[in-house]
Amino acid sequence: MEIIPAIDLKDGRCVRLYQGDFQQVTVYGDDPVAIAQHWFEQGAPRLHLVDLDGARSGQPVHTDIIRAIVRSFGAPVQLGGGLRSIEAVERALELGVQRVVLGTAAVEHPDMIAHLVAQFGDAIAVAIDARNGMAATAGWTETAAMSAVDLLERMVTLGVRRVIYTDISRDGTLSEPNIAATGALVRPDGPAIIASGGISTLDHLRRLADVGVEGAIVGRALYTGDLSLREALAAFQ
């Protein structure tokens, strides 16, 4: 199982939100490039970058920071937030981003997802962000009339190969991930599942590995020191 540190970008800084609430922000650094360097030096196999301002506005905001991270280290980066058009996805990939993560577009424009998967294959991942079992969009500020499970089924029909699942109520809480809901999305012939939200201990990671996820995105727990990236990586080599 791959352990992936998260860097969430807001106002040019590295932050974490509590349950996706833009009014509950904790700043963990003013230099996201230096933070990226730290995680790569700790052995991170890739980084999960989220342009929070982009997610809320509908178009990428932190392009310069993302470019600097990608070009400074030459290591794999996956990017989400504000990627709601084919052009935005193409520009992100041109920056050197290895994998783009689409959330709102998956709900609102499934035809676009099908086009992108056909064109870019593994470079396209879909974020299924759930609040009370229902898919959330627009930087988690809106809730769609579609369940997370139904959204997964739709993505399967479109050929999506990788899904990042987040239970919003757990995100940024350090409580624990929603193991049951995450495991319900894992199918032998389905897309690879990456878990996110509430992960803060090695036991959480082990339980996620037991249900068959491909990877786990860890944010706040790494910044608070509740979880050591080196220890987590060593446990899942």
UniProtKB/Swiss-Prot annotation:
Localization per Swiss-Prot or TrEMBL: Cytoplasm
Keyword Cytoplasm among UniProt keywords: yes
Keywords from the UniProt entry: Amino-acid biosynthesis, Cytoplasm, Histidine biosynthesis, Isomerase
Broad class of enzyme this protein falls into: isomerase
Pathway the protein contributes to: Amino-acid biosynthesis; L-histidine biosynthesis; L-histidine from 5-phospho-alpha-D-ribose 1-diphosphate: step 4/9
GO molecular function terms attached to this record: 1-(5-phosphoribosyl)-5-[(5-phosphoribosylamino)methylideneamino]imidazole-4-carboxamide isomerase activity
Active site: D8, D129
Catalytic activity: 1-(5-phospho-beta-D-ribosyl)-5-[(5-phospho-beta-D-ribosylamino)methylideneamino]imidazole-4-carboxamide = 5-[(5-phospho-1-deoxy-D-ribulos-1-ylimino)methylamino]-1-(5-phospho-beta-D-ribosyl)imidazole-4-carboxamide
The keyword Transit peptide appears for this protein: no
EC number: 5.3.1.16
CDD domains: HisA (cd04732)
Pfam families from the UniProt entry: His_biosynth
HAMAP family linked to this entry: HisA
Protein name: 1-(5-phosphoribosyl)-5-[(5-phosphoribosylamino)methylideneamino] imidazole-4-carboxamide isomerase
Species of origin: Roseiflexus castenholzii (strain DSM 13941 / HLO8)
The encoding gene: hisA
